[in-house]
Amino acid sequence: MSNDEFSDNERLKQQSQLLRGTIKEDLHNELTGGFLGDNFQLIRFHGMYQQDDRDIRQERAAQMLEPLHTVMLRVRLPGGIISPQQWLGIDEFASQHTLYGSIRITNRQALQLHGVLKRNIKPVHRLLHQLGLDSRATAGDVNRNVLCTSNPVESRLHHQAYEWAKKISEHLLPKTNAYAEVWLDGEKIAQPEEEPILGNNYLPRKFKTAVVIPPQNDVDLHANDLNFIAIGDNGQLTGFNVLVGGGLAMTHGDQSTYPRLATELGYIPLNATLAVATAVVATQRDLGNRANRRNAKTKYTIDRLGIEVFKAEVELRAGLAFQPLRPYAFSSRGDRIGWVEGIDGKHHLTLFIPSGRLIDKPGKPLKSGLAAIAAVHTGDFRLTPNQNIIIAGVSERNRAQIDALAQRYSLIDDTVSPQRKSAMACVSYPTCPLAMAEAERVLPDIVDRLDAILIRNGIADRDVIFRVTGCPNGCGRAMLAEIGLVGRAVGRYDIYLGGNREGTRIPRLYKENQPLEEIIRDLDALLSAWAQADNPDEAFGDFAIQTGIIRPVLNSSIDFYLQD
């Protein structure tokens, strides 16, 4: 492929001096609060997205002002583990140096700080460095934050799996010194640099990796390019089943784009893990589509080449043959809210955090509560892919103190319904530049109305995996929900039905471009019919398929867009 056929993102990566660009110079440009030219894209590789407050965009334009530019910074936390001391440092920065004063737990076990002004960007990177953290490769065409199942009960296996998640993350990080040079005033490297795994043009598109511990599929493995499913023997990790090619993003009106479940390749022993991770990434690096970013993800590479060709290429590069898959099964995706005791005798408290947003509100000082717990906790915090937080490793002696703090700050709330615990939304408005419709801000009201429907039908103890995403890029993972809403325009969504509770089936389009009030009426009728079927063991997504409300998606590359 000639350079003329590459997308412009390939040009800017090629000319970026291994992700340096002119970011340092842009930091000193006080005429704008944003980043210009290629730097707008390049800062993503450093873990940031340029945004503005869309609620006041028109008002500022009327005043002849540029948009209120800020960045959203994403902290890299492989497996979602963070110490109380690290948490307190981030908490203080969020309170004092961001416009919104909040911390957001992402569904990829990272932390996001929204509303960081240009003058505070370098200080936040220095703070992260002092805390032993960074934001490298949490955005851009690289391997993103590596997920790991949040399983505090099986502590030995979880710890082993987490260690591998951390190893994979470090192994696949960009090797350029650009991050240290730009943000930490590190010494400039004199000798030529190379990116031995990612390549000097990096990957064709973002790449997501997860380590999964059955029977929990909290990481939503089918949203990821590369998955390592932990296989254990008597609580000891022995190897991984490898799955590739998952992904949920699509583009409205472009049927060459679609969500896709990951495909099984086979089993590998532990000592082959990094070789296989490298081989999968390198195969996508060399064979992925660099001309059309809409079709640049690993899922499209696999469907274009065929899974057997892709598998053979990975085996060749890794120098091995995949063994037959080991048995595994998933039973759930949700978090066990409340206290559980691990096999090590330590106690773990999982706290429900609505949409992962930690902020102090009247009667709900959640952010202050987590800071109060962090000040006395001697274990660690674990962020879950359901955007909750686990106070992990609490001794019997300290349990009462932690529980009292959680109660005092309303972090424990027994009135939260099962349905609210099973709902998820992306950030969307006001900060996401891609948002087409509300998501996080409208979710509480939608769930209130769903709860009312369930209560009226006598099934308040049941719930549906329900997700709202403000655009079709998939951050809210609506394409793995039993009911998913995908934003079309302000106040309007596509309705998808028929995913399952385990997260192993893609839902199908039920109705397109519906106003929210119509959606609530439709869901009222659907949930009422589910209740009247009077089968407590049948999940809603299964009910929708069994009764013919929607046809199952069997092979999304072929039948995702087929309609009755």
Swiss-Prot record:
[4Fe-4S] cluster binds at residues 426, 432, 471, 475. Its cofactor is siroheme; [4Fe-4S] cluster. Pathway: Sulfur metabolism; hydrogen sulfide biosynthesis; hydrogen sulfide from sulfite (NADPH route): step 1/1. Keywords: 4Fe-4S, Amino-acid biosynthesis, Cysteine biosynthesis, Heme, Iron, Iron-sulfur, Metal-binding, NADP, Oxidoreductase. GO terms for biological process: cysteine biosynthetic process; hydrogen sulfide biosynthetic process; sulfate assimilation. PROSITE patterns: NIR_SIR. Component of the sulfite reductase complex that catalyzes the 6-electron reduction of sulfite to sulfide. This is one of several activities required for the biosynthesis of L-cysteine from sulfate. Belongs to the nitrite and sulfite reductase 4Fe-4S domain family. HAMAP family: CysI. This is Sulfite reductase [NADPH] hemoprotein beta-component 2. It comes from Klebsiella pneumoniae (strain 342). The lineage of its organism: Bacteria, Pseudomonadati, Pseudomonadota, Gammaproteobacteria, Enterobacterales.
